[in-house]
């Protein structure tokens, strides 16, 4: 089965929050559209495809003001979403939604250089009744995302009503998410709150950073589960949903996520005086999600155990600590 998603105008609308007043238009849009490069955005602006309210914007450096309604219109490339028989564990499914356990190494949806092997491809094969269209041509059914090398529970909408109501819950921060994360070094406080705005790195565009281009509020709560000789195991609860948020927050404290070379984790892990090990993925796992059913309002909660690769790594660390 395949779904041909024809070329069409992709319309995205944003309202400028108070803390973005005075920011350059291209910088603001860069923070809102991580799937676009800044050069692409600048071409779109100069082509007159961006509106501020009812007025056409053509200057990339124009300053935006709180309350401005910005509309971006562009023609995306034609995308074909093809159902693929990929391994996928479905934790729950009904007529409105599904909850699945995404493996590490699987992208959520198509993007630059990735046209197959994604979660969307797997969903089209395994789920009955289709996916919502609100997510657009690239992201049918996708209400929120997990990074490619992050595993765990992810929520999917099967119709537009469910998608909008679930998206509203994410926007109001009423969805509870808990991650298990192993970081380098000893995190001193047993529990804490990291509050640092996150934006795109102006030099390394694939990365985010504290501050950066068009930074947005980002808050992560954490609790120490266990300390090892060289690592700390944590439960992390993001209160906001910024790209790479947990990874960026802990890297900014000099505690990068184990296996996360993009944000400074070493390739070889020190696990003993003379011993080194490697981990072929980030030690970041979406362990739990809790939300209200979009149709009934009932509270729903789903969990995912640590994947065997991560559980085995923890067992190895425990043996080293004895």
PLM segments and residue spans:
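Well-ordered beta-strand positions
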Residues: 91-92, 199, 223-226, 237
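Pseudouridine synthases involved in rRNA/tRNA modification
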Residues: 1-40, 203, 212-213, 219, ...
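RNA pseudouridine synthases
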Residues: 1-202, 283, 306-318
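Short beta-strand segments enriched for Tyr within beta-sheet-rich domains
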Residues: 166, 242-250
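Conserved hydrophobic positions within beta-strands
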Residues: 90, 183, 221-224, 257
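Short histidine-centered loop motifs in beta-beta connectors
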Residues: 54-56, 229, 234-236
